[in-house]
UniProtKB/Swiss-Prot annotation:
Regions of compositional bias (Low complexity) in chain numbering: 793-825
One record GO biological process: proteolysis
One of the Pfam families matching this protein, by short name: PBP1_TM
Membrane topology: Single-pass type II membrane protein
Region (Transpeptidase): 444-736
The protein's name in its UniProt record: Penicillin-binding protein 1B
Regions of this protein lying in the Cytoplasmic compartment: 1-63
Note: A third isozyme, Beta, lacking the first 25 N-terminal amino acids of the isoform Alpha and a fourth isozyme, Delta, have been found, but seem to result from the artifactual degradation of the isoform Alpha and isoform Gamma respectively.
InterPro entries named among the record's database cross-references: Beta-lactam/transpept-like, Glyco_trans_51, Glycosyltr_51/Transpeptidase, Lysozyme-like_dom_sf, PBP1b_TM, PBP_1b, PBP_transglycosylase, PCN-bd_Tpept
UniProt region (UvrB domain 2 homolog), positions on chain: 109-200
TM ranges: 64-87
Catalytic activity, reaction form: [GlcNAc-(1->4)-Mur2Ac(oyl-L-Ala-gamma-D-Glu-L-Lys-D-Ala-D-Ala)](n)-di-trans,octa-cis-undecaprenyl diphosphate + beta-D-GlcNAc-(1->4)-Mur2Ac(oyl-L-Ala-gamma-D-Glu-L-Lys-D-Ala-D-Ala)-di-trans,octa-cis-undecaprenyl diphosphate = [GlcNAc-(1->4)-Mur2Ac(oyl-L-Ala-gamma-D-Glu-L-Lys-D-Ala-D-Ala)](n+1)-di-trans,octa-cis-undecaprenyl diphosphate + di-trans,octa-cis-undecaprenyl diphosphate + H(+); Preferential cleavage: (Ac)2-L-Lys-D-Ala-|-D-Ala. Also transpeptidation of peptidyl-alanyl moieties that are N-acyl substituents of D-alanine
Classification via Gene3D superfamilies: Biosynthetic peptidoglycan transglycosylase-like, Cytochrome c1, transmembrane anchor, C-terminal, DD-peptidase/beta-lactamase superfamily, Penicillin-binding protein 1b domain
Length: 844
C-alpha cells in the first residue's frame, strides 16, 4: 500500500507522465478533442484505479458522488411517480365509484291533504310540528308556517317522493270548523285537489361500518355555511393545491413558540383524505401519505367536489353505536331541520364541532359548545362576513338544540316490525339496503302520544300500586287500512330490548268476549241484541273428571236468571258468555277468531277460551279488533308502504287491500255494543271523560289480575294497550284501572276523532220493551237490529219469547235454569284441557 502510494510522484525524471495523466482524465470528459492521444495511451496505459490520495483524484470523486445521487434521485422520482399512480388509482376507484355505503333512510307516512277532509286547524298545527315544521311570524324559507284566524300558510319543503320529485310550494290551507275547506297555491292562486306533505325522517338503518349520513349535493348546502366552514377551517381553500405551505409555516411557528402541538396545518382536502383513506395513526409516514394524496385529489377533482365530499363525510357526533357523519344528518340530529334551513348561529355550532365533536357536544358540554360557537361567529365578524351588530345578536342566542333523540330516534319496536316486513317482502334483497329510502306508515303524532302515555302512565301506576316492575305495550293501527301508526314495546320506548308489542304472548282475558258475541250476531235469525241469555250458576264436567264452574266477576247473578245479549257484553259478564259460547259451539267461535286474523296455532277449542284462555301478542289482538272496527273487513297489519332504491327503482310498493271476513251487519252490532261498554259499561270512566266521541272499547283482566288489557276504537284508529309484569305476577290492577288508564293518557296527548257509526244495509233501529219484545213505537230502549223487514217484527202477535231457534228460550217463569246438557255434550269432543283451569280469567 505504501509503495503504491509513493510510486506515481517518485518518478521525477519523466516530465511527460503528468501530461499523460492530465490528457487521460480530460479524455473521459471530452473524447472528441483528444483523439490524438489514443495511440500514446495504448502504448503505455495508466492504471485507472489508483489507491493513492493524490490531488488529481479529488475532482473525479465528487463528480462520482453527484452522479450516484442523481441516479438515486431519478430512481426515487420514478418510485414516487409509480406510487402516485397507485394512490391516484386508489382515490379514483372510490371517489368515482360508490364513495359510501349509505344507510337506509326510514321515513314516516306521507300525509295526503284534500279539500273537505276532516281535520281542524289545531290538528293541522300539531301535524306540521310533528313533521318538523316551525311556526313563525313571517315565512322566509321552506319548513315554516304561519297561523291566521281560520287558515295556515306554509312553505312545503321540496322532496323526492316515491313517484316524483316535487319542489317547494307556498300554500294556504283554509279551515271551516273541523274540516279543511280549501288548499290554494299562493304563487298562482290555483286550488289544489290533492296536496301532500313531505314525510318525516324517523330513523336510519345503519350501514355495516356503523356510519349514518344523508347525502346532499354541493348545491344543497347554503353558501353561508360553506363560508363559515372555510373561514374557520381553511380560509385559503380556493388558493392552495391541497396542502397549504402558509398554514404549515404558521403551525410550525405556533407549535415552536408554545413548546407543544397547539395548531394543526391540515387543509380540508387533507382532512378528507384522512377520513376516507387513512387511519388516525400519528406518524410521519401517514402525514406524508396524507399530503401526497391531497395534492393528487386537488389536481384530480374540482374544489366544489372536494367540498361536497367533505361536508358529507365530516364526523359530527355519536348516536349510540353509530357515527353521525356529515352536516345534513347532523342538522337533523341536533336541530330537527334540514341543513338548508339552519340559521347562521346553528351553522356556526356545527362548524365549531368539526374541531372536536365530543368536546363540543351541545348536550354533554353546553358551555364549551356555546363558547366554541361564539368563537366561530367572532371569526366571521373579524373576516367581515357579518357585522358587529349581527354578531352581538347571534352570540346572545342560546344553543337552541332539540332534546336528544327528538327527531332521529331508534324506534326499536316499530323498526322490528319494519325489518320483519322487509325480510318477508324483499327476501335476499334485504341484505343490501345501502342508500335505500323506506317509506312507512309511522305516524309521528300518534307515536309521540303513545310514548308520552307510557313514560308518564307507568310510573304513576307503579307509585299507586307500589310495584317497581310494571310494563306496558301499545299498538295503534289505522281502523280501515290496517297500517300500523305507532308502537311502544315497553315503559322505556327507546330501549332496544324486549318488544312486548310483538313478542309478549299473554292471556287476553275478557278481550276474547267480543268474538263470541260476533259469532252469535252473525246468525240474525237466532241471535239479536235483545236475545236473552242464561245467567245462573253452571258446572261443566271435563273429560278428566274435573268440574269447571265459571263465575261473574262480582260473584253475583241476575235476579231473573237471564240477561240480554247486549247487556252481557256491555257488562263483560262471564257466565252468560260461557252459556252463549257453548250453545254456539267452540268450533264456530274458533272459526270466527281465524276470520278475525288470529294465528290458527294459537287457538285451542276449550271452554276457557271463551273467557280468554288464548295467548296472543298485542299486535295480534290489534288485528282482530281492526277487523271488527272496520265493519268486518280484515286488512293485514302492515308498516311498510314502499321501498325505493338509490337509483330510483321501486323495490316494493304496497297496495293495502281489505277482504270481507265477517258480515258487515254483525260487525256493526258488535262495535255498537262496544260503544255501550264505554258509555255505561266497564269503560264508563272513559266515556265520562270523552262523552262526545262515542268511543268503542273493551276491557280485559286475566285471572289474579296478572294482565290488564284495553282495546280502544275512535273514528280513525284501533289502539291496544297492555299493562302487566314480565314475571307473570299480579298487578293489583283491572283492565279499567290499568290498561285503560294508559289509553286515556294516549288520547289526552293527541286529538281523537269521533266514532260516528254508519249502519250498513239491513240494519234498523227498533224499540224494545222491558221484556225485550219489539214494539212498533216507543219502547224502553232502542237497539239496532239486523233485519230486512223491521215492520213485521213489531207486528208479531206474540213477542213474549225469543224466536224458536234460540236455545235460551225461557218459559213464563224467568227463574227457570237453562239446560246444561248442550254444554256438557260439547265437552265430549274437547281435548287438551289439562292446565286450562289455571288459565281461567276474570271479567274485566
Amino acid at each position: 500500500m505504501a509503495g503504491n502510494d509513493r510510486e506515481p510522484i517518485g518518478r521525477k525524471g519523466k516530465p511527460t507522465r503528468p501530461v499523460k495523466q492530465k490528457v487521460s482524465r480530460r479524455r473521459y470528459e471530452d473524447d472528441d478533442d483528444y483523439d490524438d492521444y489514443d495511440d500514446y495511451e495504448d502504448e503505455e496505459p495508466m492504471p485507472r484505479k489508483g489507491k493513492g490520495k493524490g490531488k488529481g483524484r479529488k475532482p473525479r470523486g465528487k463528480r462520482g458522488w453527484l452522479w450516484l445521487l442523481l441516479k438515486l434521485a431519478i430512481v426515487f422520482a420514478v418510485l414516487i411517480a409509480i406510487y402516485g399512480v397507485y394512490l391516484d388509482q386508489k382515490i379514483r376507484s372510490r371517489i368515482d365509484g360508490k364513495v359510501w355505503q349509505l344507510p337506509a333512510a326510514v321515513y314516516g307516512r306521507m300525509v295526503n291533504l284534500e279539500p273537505d277532509m276532516t281535520i281542524s286547524k289545531n290538528e293541522m298545527v300539531k301535524l306540521l310540528e310533528a313533521t318538523q315544521y316551525r311556526q313563525v311570524s313571517k315565512m322566509t324559507r321552506p319548513g315554516e308556517f304561519t297561523v291566521q284566524a281560520n287558515s295556515i300558510e306554509m312553505i312545503r319543503r321540496p322532496f323526492d317522493f316515491p313517484d316524483s320529485k316535487e319542489g317547494q310550494v307556498r300554500a294556504r290551507l283554509t279551515f271551516d270548523g273541523d274540516h279543511l275547506a280549501t288548499i290554494v297555491n299562493m304563487e298562482n292562486n290555483r286550488q289544489f285537489g290533492f296536496f301532500r306533505l313531505d314525510p318525516r325522517l324517523i330513523t336510519m338503518i345503519s350501514s355495516p361500518n356503523g356510519e349514518q349520513r344523508l347525502f346532499v349535493p354541493r348545491s344543497g348546502f347554503p353558501d353561508l355555511l360553506v363560508d363559515t366552514l372555510l373561514a374557520t377551517e381553511d380560509r385559503h381553500f380556493y388558493e392552495h393545491d391541497g396542502i397549504s405551505l402558509y398554514s404549515i409555516g404558521r403551525a410550525v411557528l405556533a407549535n415552536l413558540t408554545a413548546g407543544r402541538t397547539v395548531q394543526g396545518a391540515s387543509t380540508l382536502t387533507q382532512q378528507l383524505v384522512k377520513n376516507l383513506f387513512l387511519s388516525s395513526e400519528r406518524s410521519y409516514w401517514r402525514k406524508a401519505n396524507e399530503a401526497y394524496m391531497a395534492l393528487i385529489m386537488d389536481a384530480r377533482y374540482s374544489k366544489d367536489r372536494i367540498l361536497e365530499l367533505y361536508m358529507n363525510e365530516v364526523y359530527l357526533g355519536q348516536s349510540g353505536d353509530n357515527e353521525i357523519r356529515g352536516f345534513p344528518l347532523a342538522s337533523l340530529y341536533y336541530f330537527g331541520r334540514p341543513v338548508e334551513e339552519l340559521s347562521l348561529d346553528q351553522q356556526a355550532l356545527l362548524v365549531g364541532m368539526v374541531k372536536g365533536a365530543s368536546i363540543y357536544n351541545p348536550w354533554r358540554n353546553p358551555k364549551l359548545a356555546l363558547e366554541r360557537r361564539n368563537l366561530v361567529l367572532r371569526l366571521l365578524q373579524q373576516q367581515q362576513i357579518i357585522d358587529q351588530e349581527l354578531y352581538d345578536m347571534l352570540s346572545a342566542r342560546p344553543l337552541g338544540v332539540q332534546p336528544r333523540g327528538g327527531v332521529i330516534s331508534p324506534q326499536p319496536a316499530f323498526m322490528q316490525l319494519v325489518r320483519q316486513e322487509l325480510q318477508a317482502k324483499l327476501g335476499d334483497k334485504v341484505k343490501d339496503l345501502s342508500g335505500v329510502k323506506i317509506f312507512t306508515t309511522f305516524d309521528s303524532v300518534a307515536q309521540d302520544a303513545a310514548e308520552k302515555a307510557a313514560v308518564e302512565g307507568i310510573p304513576a301506576l307503579k307509585k299507586q300500586r307500589k310495584l317497581s316492575d310494571l310494563e306496558t305495550a301499545i299498538v295503534v293501527v289505522d281502523r280501515f287500512s290496517g297500517e300500523v301508526r305507532a308502537m311502544v314495546g315497553g315503559s322505556e320506548p327507546q330501549f332496544a330490548g324486549y318488544n312486548r308489542a310483538m313478542q309478549a304472548r299473554r292471556s287476553i282475558g275478557s278481550l276474547a268476549k267480543p268474538a263470541t258475541y260476533l259469532t252469535a250476531l252473525s246468525q240474525p235469525k237466532i241471535y239479536r241484541l235483545n236475545t236473552w241469555i242464561a245467567d245462573a250458576p253452571i258446572a261443566l264436567r271435563q273429560p278428566n273428571g274435573q268440574v269447571w264452574s265459571p263465575q261473574n266477576d262480582d260473584r253475583r247473578y241476575s235476579e231473573s236468571g237471564r240477561v240480554m245479549l247486549v247487556d252481557a257484553l256491555t257488562r263483560s259478564m262471564n257466565v252468560p258468555t260461557v252459556n252463549l259460547g257453548m250453545a254456539l259451539g267452540l268450533p264456530a267461535v274458533t272459526e270466527t277468531w281465524i276470520k278475525l286474523g288470529v294465528p290458527k296455532d294459537q287457538l285451542h277449542p276449550v271452554p276457557a277460551m271463551l273467557l280468554g284462555a288464548l295467548n296472543l301478542t298485542p299486535i295480534e289482538v290489534a288485528q282482530a279488533f281492526q277487523t271488527i272496527a272496520s265493519g268486518g273487513n280484515r286488512a293485514p297489519l302492515s308498516a311498510l308502504r314502499s321501498v325505493i332504491a338509490e337509483d330510483g327503482k321501486v323495490l316494493y310498493q304496497s297496495f293495502p287491500q281489505a277482504e270481507r271476513a265477517v258480515p258487515a251487519q254483525a260487525a256493526y252490532l258488535t262495535l255498537w255494543t262496544m260503544q255501550q261498554v264505554v258509555q255505561r259499561g266497564t269503560g264508563r270512566q272513559l266515556g265520562a271523560k270523552y262523552p262526545n266521541l262515542h268511543l268503542a272499547g273493551k276491557t280485559g283482566t286475566t285471572n289474579n289480575n296478572v294482565d290488564t288489557w284495553f282495546a280502544g276504537i275512535d273514528g280513525s284508529t284501533v289502539t291496544i294497550t297492555w299493562v302487566g309484569r314480565d314475571n307473570n305476577q299480579p298487578t293489583k290492577l283491572y283492565g279499567a284501572s290499568g290498561a285503560m288508564s294508559i289509553y286515556q293518557r294516549y288520547l289526552a296527548n293527541q286529538t281523537p276523532t269521533p266514532l260516528n257509526l254508519v249502519p250498513p244495509e239491513d240494519i234498523a233501529d227498533m224499540g224494545v220493551d222491558y221484556d225485550g219484545n219489539f214494539v212498533c213505537s216507543g219502547g224502553m230502549r232502542i237497539l239496532p237490529v239486523w233485519t230486512s223487514d223491521p215492520q213485521s217484527l213489531c207486528q208479531q202477535s206474540e213477542m213474549q219469547q225469543q224466536p224458536s231457534g234460540n236455545p235460551f228460550d225461557q218459559s213464563s217463569q224467568p227463574q227457570q235454569q237453562p239446560q246444561q246438557q248442550p254444554a256438557q255434550q260439547e265437552q265430549k269432543d274437547s281435548d287438551g284441557v289439562a292446565g286450562w283451569i289455571k288459565d281461567m280469567f276474570g271479567s274485566n
